[in-house]
């Protein structure tokens, strides 16, 4: 498994540092994200004035499939324009089925909206470890694409790269991956400190420009995390097909009142959680572990008994390691949309099996994260567009109920220990 409004349109501006002798070649434009958008259509239009009225001419540049809320274009596009009017940019939000879900925004002059980028390289979109919900043991590397690149090489290093302005691999490389979309999910846990960066590649695999600036990720057991999260992609984060775990508003941990280290991994079944527990969870010596799992088992034909057995084993592992397990109930899914977007059938008895697992979880130390959706047979489209991954609003609801119930659980656990 995998993944404000434009009517109040204003642009956020960002710089990327580069070498002193570099000349600006790219323009970077970013706009406030529409949480319902899957992608955007971006265009540059000349705007003229006649008798005080603005008139828009045909676009000089248009990209109908911009991934997420920012774009980079070549500066030459605007520099070479010698026609009438002022060049302005507009965006509109596109939905899951390719339909427009907003009108084009009001035109904003490019001289205000665009930032010159002196490094011809992809731009890293997110920073880790800055606020609640932004610490992932399994990172997602997300970036903004550049013109002329047909694929991208993501490099992970165990020391800061020695060639920040080059295009050769670092001598400190520990992993690399090639992608055609602007993100890569790490399949391995990143414990300790690593750096990552990305460069564009042409159709022959040669470099387009240079490496992006390297970003540091720290997942240090010495930071003494009190609370961890273990689960599949519902806990890992992401949603609405195009948003990854690095898009923090699509992660319920982002809405929590307390810091967490997220040890979840997209695609996991409960047996996977059990298998990687010792290596991924124990080194961090957390006091509490929020556990959600079973969705992938049950939708693919697994039984409630198998899931419950794995969850019981996870509870035992936690207690043996001095960790208090807190189980989370699993929210409903929508099989029709899972089939439509992922071409995966769902077991016909999924609902009954979900109910069995959630019924058992409610007899344990738990938080009922499925409760906000109890009135639905299937998860509605506005809460999980793809039928599988809860979107921003649903993640907020899950975070809210965890915030409400977790202090009570902590208090009860403390009182029980005192009595003993």
Which ranges hold each PLM region?
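Beta-strand-rich modules
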Residues: 79-99, 188-204
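Serine-esterase "nucleophile elbow" of acetyl-processing enzymes
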Residues: 206-266, 275-285
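Substrate-gating cap/lid alpha-helix
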Residues: 335-371
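Recognizes extended acidic, P/S/T-rich segments that occur
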Residues: 43-86, 156-189
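Conserved aromatic anchor
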Residues: 26-36, 137-148
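Histidine-centered active-site loop/cap adjacent to the catalytic His
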Residues: 273, 365, 382-420
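Extracellular fibronectin type III
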Residues: 96-116, 203-219
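Oxyanion-hole/transition-state-stabilizing segment in secreted/luminal serine hydrolases
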Residues: 242-243, 249, 270-310, 331-335
């Amino acid at each position: 498994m995998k993944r404000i409004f434009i009517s109040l349109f204003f642009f956020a501006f960002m710089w990327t540092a580069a070498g002193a002798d570099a000349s600006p070649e790219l323009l970077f434009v970013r706009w406030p994200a529409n949480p319902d958008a899957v992608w955007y259509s971006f265009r540059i239009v000349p705007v003229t004035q006649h008798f005080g009225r603005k008139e828009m001419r045909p676009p000089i540049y248009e990209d109908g499939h911009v991934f997420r809320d920012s774009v980079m274009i070549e500066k030459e596009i605007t520099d070479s324009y010698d026609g009438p009017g002022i060049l302005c940019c507009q965006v509109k939000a596109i939905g899951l089925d390719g339909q427009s879900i907003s009108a084009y925004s009001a035109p904003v002059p490019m001289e205000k909206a665009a930032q010159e980028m002196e490094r011809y390289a992809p731009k890293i979109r997110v920073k880790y470890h800055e606020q609640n919900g932004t610490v992932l043991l399994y990172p997602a590397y997300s970036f903004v694409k550049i013109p002329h690149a047909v694929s991208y090489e993501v490099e992970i290093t165990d020391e800061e790269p020695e060639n920040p302005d080059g295009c050769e691999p670092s001598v400190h490389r520990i992993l690399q991956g090639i992608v055609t979309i602007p993100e890569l999910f790490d399949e391995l846990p990143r414990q300790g400190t690593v750096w990552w960066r990305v460069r564009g590649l042409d159709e022959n695999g040669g470099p387009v420009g240079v490496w992006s600036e390297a970003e540091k990720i720290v997942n240090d057991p010495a930071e003494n995390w009190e609370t961890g999260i273990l689960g599949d992609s519902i806990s890992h984060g992401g949603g609405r097909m195009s948003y990854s775990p690095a898009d923090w508003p699509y992660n319920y941990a982002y809405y929590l009142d307390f810091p967490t280290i997220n040890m979840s991994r997209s695609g996991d079944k409960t047996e996977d959680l059990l298998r990687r527990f010792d290596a991924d969870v124990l080194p961090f010596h957390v006091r509490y572990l929020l556990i959600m799992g079973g969705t992938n088992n049950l939708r693919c034909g697994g039984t409630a008994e198998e899931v419950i057995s794995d969850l019981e084993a996870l509870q035992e592992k936690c207690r043996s390691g001095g960790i208090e397990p807190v189980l989370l109930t699993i929210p409903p899914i929508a099989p029709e949309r899972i089939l439509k977007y992922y071409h995966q059938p769902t077991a016909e008895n999924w609902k009954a099996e979900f109910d069995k697992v959630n019924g058992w979880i409610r007899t344990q130390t738990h938080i009922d994260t499925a409760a906000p959706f109890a009135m639905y047979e299937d998860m509605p489209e506005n809460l999980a567009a793809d039928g599988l991954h809860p979107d921003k609003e649903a993640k907020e609801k899950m975070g809210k109920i965890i915030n409400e119930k977790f202090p009570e659980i902590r208090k009860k656990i403390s009182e029980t220990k005192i009595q003993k």
